[in-house]
Regions:
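Second-shell loop/turn segments in exported
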Residues: 49-52, 101-110, 156-159
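Bacterial signal peptide processing site
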Residues: 26-28
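Surface-exposed binding/hinge segments that line
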Residues: 118, 127-128, 132-178
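N-terminal lobe/hinge region of extracytoplasmic solute-binding protein
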Residues: 39-88
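Short, well-ordered beta-strand elements
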Residues: 31-46, 82, 92-96, 119-122, ...
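C-terminal motif of bacterial Sec signal peptides marking the signal peptidase cleavage site
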Residues: 21-24
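Bacterial Sec-dependent N-terminal signal peptides
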Residues: 1-10
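Aromatic- and charge-enriched surface segment that lines or borders ligand/interaction sites
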Residues: 82-133
Length: 178
């Protein structure tokens, strides 16, 4: 009788455990629309133009598009730019912006179109705030180092121009591989 009772309890425990395990693996009937991710630390700010901390960069990379981006294979593809050209000497990059690119508020409401002047203003803001990320472009963009170090206070001498609302142009000091 003890063996039979022991077998019965073992079998009942096994069935119960399997049931719990299978129910935990099942699909929920309502799919969550929230993506959760744990970052190693909180960002001190979301001002990606003024700071270059990993916590900020990781979050902002999911919120803000650049002119170009990498596809799943690492190839450069358009993002905010629909097309771009590089001069033969490798010093001038001209980007044509998508007409449908928009800025949105934190509530998700359309705010304004993205324009070429936004890129000029953004670089000037980063330079004026002495952004921690300027080291990435300071020696590449023509005139930027002189502006940052105070050799000139005229930002129009920096190699970034809005040619029209949809076209932004960067002039470099020397050709870059990236």
């Amino acid at each position: 009788m003890k063996k039979s009772k022991s077998k019965y309890l073992t079998l009942a425990g096994l069935v119960l455990g399997t049931g719990v395990l299978l129910s935990a693996c099942g699909n929920s009937s309502t799919a969550s629309k929230t993506y959760n991710y744990v970052y190693s630390s909180d960002p001190s700010s979301l001002n990606y133009l003024a700071e270059n901390r990993a916590a900020t960069s990781d979050i902002v990379a999911n919120l803000v598009d650049g002119l170009l981006e990498n596809d799943q294979y690492g190839n450069i593809i358009p993002s905010l730019a629909e097309d771009w050209t590089v001069s033969q000497d490798g010093l001038t990059y001209t980007y044509k912006l998508r007409k449908d690119a928009k800025w949105f508020t934190s509530e998700g409401e359309e705010y304004a179109p993205v324009t070429a002047q936004d890129f000029v203003t953004g670089l000037q803001y980063a330079a004026d705030k002495k952004s921690e990320a300027l080291y990435l472009v300071q020696d590449s963009v023509a005139g930027l180092d002189d502006y940052i170090t105070g050799k000139t206070s005229d930002f129009s001498t920096v190699g970034v121009k809005a040619l029209d609302d949809q076209t932004v142009q960067y002039t470099l000091v020397k050709p870059e591989l990236y």
